Amino acid sequence: MAYDLIIKGGTIYDGNGTEPITGDVAVKDGRIAAIGTNLGEADRVIDAAGAIVTPGFLDLHTHYDGQVSWDADLQPSVNHGVTTAVMGSCGVGFAPVLPKDHDRLVRLMEGVEDIPGTALAEGLTWNWESFADYMDAIDFPHTIDYAAQIVHDPLRVYVMGDRAVSDEPATAEDIAKMRELTRAALEAGAVGFSTGRSDVHRTADGDWTPASEATKEELVGIAEAFKGLDHGVLQAVNDFDLERGDPTAFDREFDLLEAFAGAAGGRPFSLSLMQRDFAPKQWRNILARAEAAKDKGINMRLQTAPRGIGVILGLQCTFHPFIGFPSYKRISHLPLEERVDAMRDPDFKEQLLSETSEKVAGDGTAIPPLADILLQQIDFISCKMFKLGENPDYEQSVEASVYKMAQADGVTPLSKIYDILLEKDGQEFLYFPIYNYTDLNYSAVHEMMTHPQAIMGLSDGGAHVGTVCDASFPTYLLCHWARDRKQGPQIPLARAVQMLTSEIADYVGFTDRGRLEVGKKANINVIDHKNLRLHAPHMVKDLPAGGQRLLQEATGYIATVVDGKVVVEHDKLTGLRPGRLVRLGQKAA
């Protein structure tokens, strides 16, 4: 047999977590046709000697819901070996929808996920109403595969209209309709349902998200849509009313989530897990409750991240420590070059540093109150603020922090931040891990990631485009945890590959991918693991309406293959677009 493609002589990590073998992988008609040696001839041969060969990576937690309609490449995920992205996370998205609510959903996504509303308004085609219509509208050739979950906020607005945002509980009739629409979406191929209950999630107008206070009855009623189906997952984000300081909130909220997950007929459920400075024991409480839920027969998993979850701060970014200072606000509308010129004036700097930041959160803004709390403690947060450098280091000690730099220079931390942000003509960035770095190391991250109920997630690919670029998680996991880490335990490479592939595929129910096995879909990575590296994030202006976003590239991806076609070659997109919408369920293609 003549194959379409043979990947020859690589170290094959099949995704099962077992030790690798050296051999060849042959591809025919978009499927893995053979694994072994001396497999014969092929139209194309990729020399993988010295490289690792893995299944294509899956990303469980993205927000490409809008971007998928105008960006066929789904960057930056494609730059990091991702061949299947699951979107529709945290309860936000764009379907189902009535025409009168288009702007409402844009403002929702702009606020919660920091995606420019102008880009969404120009880029979205809105040629859909139902969730099935939406899936049909986005089902066209892309570079990688993608799948969609139906999301709670648009669903609630579609059914309840203005009542969805007025603190009014859903009626029994409302709940029945939401259950019916969720079932229809799942039967049309949606891979799950997501909801969000986070205090830090606000619309662009500063309002709570529509489903943030949904009742137990509503969540249980929607979850019942899964009964009798053999596919579908549930996802939630919840900070357990941390911002409101209610000591009874944690157990009350977890009871609600447990009831939600338990009502779905045994379908898998995942919850975001992270370490929070203002509730340092919360993640352990979540682990304990999740273990107890598992003992009750609830299929509960915890989405974890391989590094600190934080923000990139810079004069080009959505957020930096000076946005609330009166002097900066007077120049904030200027182009970057003019702002930098103004800020280099010593008198301007002296005046600004003599001021106190005004509140940046509140009505009319999506910025959460946490931002003001942090800005009032700039000395504290500067202990967790770092320069990433050209070879980004996300696990730095306090000795490398801005606080220590300021001490060494005999200046205040705020003055040092000011100077750093003016470097590289105002294009320098600082990294501030809001979550997962309370102890200034990854001891908690390692414990979370290696918990038996953990599953890799939380990259937020496509979201927070002006402050975050965590779609690089797969590359980071392979570089830092499976090769470079010196500060503590590493993760074996075979296990790291499993975390990015079969573990996610099995969780979602993608039976055709996630492993290098004969008959599986030929979504494959060929990686120069010894030389794999992340580059520094950088800002580009390529969104609709001239919007900007952070991108982060990698070096070391010899090839990324989707459906048997090479879509990335030596870290560059080839222009081929074999990826399509992945549907599960009765009407799956």
Protein language model features and the residues they cover:
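Acidic, glycine-enriched loop/beta-strand segments at the rims
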Residues: 13-24, 430-439, 445, 492-495, ...
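Divalent-metal coordination cores built from histidine and acidic residues
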Residues: 70-192, 228-231
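Divalent metal-coordination and catalytic microenvironments
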Residues: 10, 30, 50, 61, ...
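Histidine-rich, glycine-flanked metal-binding segment
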Residues: 1-5, 12-56, 537
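Short, glycine-/Ser/Thr-/acidic-enriched flexible segments
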Residues: 32, 39, 91-92, 153, ...
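Active-site neighborhoods of metal-dependent hydrolases
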Residues: 134, 138, 142-143, 149-159, ...
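C-terminal cap of metal-dependent C-N hydrolases
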Residues: 10, 370, 443, 447-454, ...
